[in-house]
Amino acid sequence: MAKYSSKINKIRTFALSLVFIGFIIMYVGVFFRSSVLLMSVFMILGVLSILLSTAVYFWIGMLSTKAVQVVCPNCEKPTKILGRVDMCMHCREPLTLDKNLEGKEFNESYNRKSQ
């Protein structure tokens, strides 16, 4: 079985990576101190990456408030479900609210509308 994680955690990880990518881009800009224009371009791109991560964090925060909160039957901790199937944030137990999918092997394609 492939390694899955909850959708909320995936999006949060993406936003965190944008922050670090922004810092790395700005750090690369420091090496071009002799060219003010080139250094400024790298600094602006880095700040834009950090601002984009802020927007992603805000979006996932708003999405998280609308997610269905359930108690995982495996670890008995509260977790949130986005879509028809998702994973527990704590123990990676496959979770679903759809009675038709109970007992089936976990597959993220169940969340696509073409199904």
From Swiss-Prot:
Superkingdom to which the source organism belongs: Bacteria
Which compartment or compartments is the protein found in?
Cell membrane
Q: Which GO terms describe its cellular component?
A: plasma membrane
Q: Which InterPro entries match?
A: UPF0295 (IPR020912)
Q: Which UniProt keywords apply?
A: Cell membrane, Membrane, Transmembrane, Transmembrane helix
How is this protein situated with respect to the membrane?
Multi-pass membrane protein
- Membrane spanning stretches: 18-38, 41-61
Which family does the record assign? Belongs to the UPF0295 family.
Q: What is this protein called?
A: UPF0295 protein BLi00901/BL05075
Q: Which organism is it from?
A: Bacillus licheniformis (strain ATCC 14580 / DSM 13 / JCM 2505 / CCUG 7422 / NBRC 12200 / NCIMB 9375 / NCTC 10341 / NRRL NRS-1264 / Gibson 46)
